[in-house]
From Swiss-Prot:
Binding site for Cu cation 4: H459, C522, H527
Domain Plastocyanin-like: from-to ranges: 30-146, 157-308, 408-542
Keyword RNA-binding: no
Entry protein name: Laccase-10
Lineage, highest ranks first: Eukaryota, Viridiplantae, Streptophyta, Embryophyta, Tracheophyta
EC number: 1.10.3.2
Residues reported to bind Cu cation 1: H80, H462
Catalytic activity: 4 hydroquinone + O2 = 4 benzosemiquinone + 2 H2O
Glycosylated residue positions: N76, N112, N185, N296, N323, N373, N383, N400, N441, N545
Source organism per UniProt: Arabidopsis thaliana (Mouse-ear cress)
A Gene Ontology molecular function term of the record: copper ion binding
Family annotation (NCBIfam families): laccase
Length: 558
């Protein structure tokens, strides 16, 4: 019983904080295959410790976490600790060929990092190939000793992980797509804590049940681990109070629908204030680009009030329509940093590096792509499709290796056009391994501009090594003179993954106070595969704690 054990561990941490403050937390992740049946189909999947989803990591703020990852499968493996700042410990960040070479079959690597200045819901996942479809789990960071939540303490906490499921092997799915030059097949189901819920013409194979008691409040730690789709999340007859996103507290607000993009986390309180019974939990996709294919199936689970007979009919709900842009915007526009004395919003007011990055698709020639009419769909930032190196970029930077990358990533698009209007006739991109160099402690603004090339689309952009403030969002083309005057520099939401709206833009700001090489990419796995990614190289500072630490002795070799 995975979740009761997690709850006991959580209670133990809360009950004995003096024993765990600044403690060392040790975990072993055995990466193994397991035969699993979902939607009346059985296949082998890659897992951690034979669990899907994988085990939850529990820690307090200031704890040091050591995870020994042992690779027992045929694939190369790496694990990313999504949202952990990794201050000066980039060797533990995890993206393959960016901060480390992957762990080869039969080998192991100990990820060693300290949780500094963070508390809340984060998650971990594989960061190579498409393995994160099944190799993922939660990270729960509890506040440090003597520091309560800035909201009423819930009766219980529950991790809820949303994902996708393919009947076919996911590596086969992506490899076939790359050979054809076309988009991969969409998933066959969405899942809630590993289960799709009701599936027509398929007998029930178990589903997730959230057990509650009338009159009590529960904290849901919600994670979108789906590969390619933003999701709406609802519970029939209940409303949420959102209190945190991406492990940063927000001004609480009430909603009946949560929007969560791949890579994002949302923590919300829900009160069991309805009449006893069973209530449907639903997760379904949001996609307001009419030409982009999605898996339109709804994953379901159940809220079960104590004392309710299992045969009691479940009260139902319907998620918003797939193209419910107004619902999505209402949720996103409600997010504000707490900006209190204890949790200030330290937004950079002045900017040293003002960057405009276009994010979108392109089409390159491909002589072997017969199914794609000898063309391949690609993705790019500022028209550069990122070329993955064969040596880890952080290693190349630290040891001054040459010929691996260049530091001339453009600050602005080299080709200016009506980004959200009619696409240019030439949709080809440049393929290169280019980084953008930042001096230590410099302030950065990045405007992420979607393009209509091939198709406008939402892009959940994730930045490793930093949190950032979302100071502005808009539709159409970004206008630096008009739109910057409307920026929120007082209490903008702080997070690590931002949803760039379809046919629009998002403006983020952060301080480059973490030396190393830090990946930035779309968290739609198909777009990352196609090349929508780049990296920042943050130089060492001059102070004693402003340089990246030496690499560990067991760092994997390429």
């Amino acid at each position: 019983m995975v979740f009761p054990i997690r709850i006991l561990v959580l209670f133990a941490l809360l009950a004995f904080p003096a024993c765990v403050h600044g403690a060392i937390r040790k975990y072993t992740f055995n990466v193994v295959t397991k035969q699993v049946t979902r939607i009346c189909s059985t296949k082998q999947i890659v897992t951690v410790n034979g669990k899907f989803p994988g085990p939850t990591i529990y820690a307090n703020e200031d704890d040091t976490i050591l995870v020994n990852v042992v690779n027992n499968v045929k694939y190369n493996v790496s694990i990313h600790w999504h949202g952990i700042r990794q201050l000066r410990t980039g060797w533990a960040d995890g993206p393959a060929y960016i901060t480390q070479c992957p762990i080869k079959p039969g080998h192991s690597y100990v990820y060693n990092f300290t949780v500094t200045g963070q508390r809340g819901t984060l998650w971990w996942h594989a960061h190579v190939l498409w393995l994160r479809a099944t190799v993922h789990g939660a990270i729960v960071i509890l506040p440090k000793l003597g520091l309560p939540y800035p909201f009423p303490k819930p009766h219980r906490e529950e991790v809820i992980i949303l994902g996708e499921w393919w009947k076919s092997d996911t590596e086969t799915v992506v490899n076939e797509a790359l050979k054809s030059g076309l988009a991969p097949n969409v998933s066959d189901a969405h899942v809630i804590n590993g289960h799709p819920g009701f599936v027509p013409n398929c007998p029930s194979q178990g589903n997730f049940k959230l057990a509650v008691e009338s009159g009590k409040t529960y904290m849901l730690r919600l994670i979108n681990a789906a590969l390619n789709e933003e999701l709406f999340f609802k519970i029939a007859g209940h409303r949420f109070t959102v209190v945190e996103v991406d492990a940063v507290y927000v001004k609480p607000f009430n909603t009946d629908t949560i929007l969560i993009a791949p890579g994002q986390t949302t923590t919300a309180l829900v009160s069991a204030a309805r009449p006893s019974g069973q209530y449907l939990i639903a997760a379904a996709p949001f996609q307001d680009s009419a030409v982009v294919a999605v898996d339109n199936r709804t994953a379901t689970a159940t809220v079960h009030y104590s004392g309710t007979l299992s045969a009691t009919p479940t009260k139902t709900t319907s998620p918003p329509p797939q193209n419910a842009t107004s619902v999505a915007n209402t949720f996103v526009n409600s997010l504000r940093s707490l900006n209190s004395k204890t949790y200030p919003a330290n937004v950079p007011i002045t900017v040293d590096h003002d960057l405009l990055f276009t994010v979108g698709l392109g089409i390159n020639r491909c002589h072997s792509c017969k199914a794609g009419n000898f063309s391949r769909v690609v993705a790019a930032i500022n028209n550069i499709t990122f070329k993955m190196p064969k040596t880890a970029l952080l290693q190349a930077h630290y040891f001054n290796l040459t010929g691996i990358y260049t530091t001339d990533f453009p600050a602005k698009p080299r080709r200016v056009f009506d980004f959200t209007g009619k696409p240019p006739s030439n949709l080809a991109t440049m393929k290169a391994t280019k980084l953008y160099k930042l001096p230590y402690n410099s302030t950065v603004q990045v405007v992420l501009q979607d393009t209509g090339n091939v198709a406008p689309e939402n892009h959940p952009i994730h930045l490793h090594g930093f949190n950032f403030f979302v100071v502005g969002l808009g539709t159409g083309n970004y206008n630096s003179k008009k739109d910057s005057n409307k920026f929120n520099l007082v209490d903008p939401v702080e997070r690590n993954t931002v949803g760039v709206p379809s046919g629009g833009w998002a403006a983020i700001r952060f301080r480059a106070d973490n030396p190393g090489v830090w990946f930035m990419h779309c968290h739609l796995e198909v777009h990352t595969t196609w090349g929508l990614k780049m990296a920042f190289l943050v130089e060492n500072g001059k102070g004693p704690n402003q340089s990246i630490r030496p690499p560990p002795s067991d760092l994997p070799k390429c």
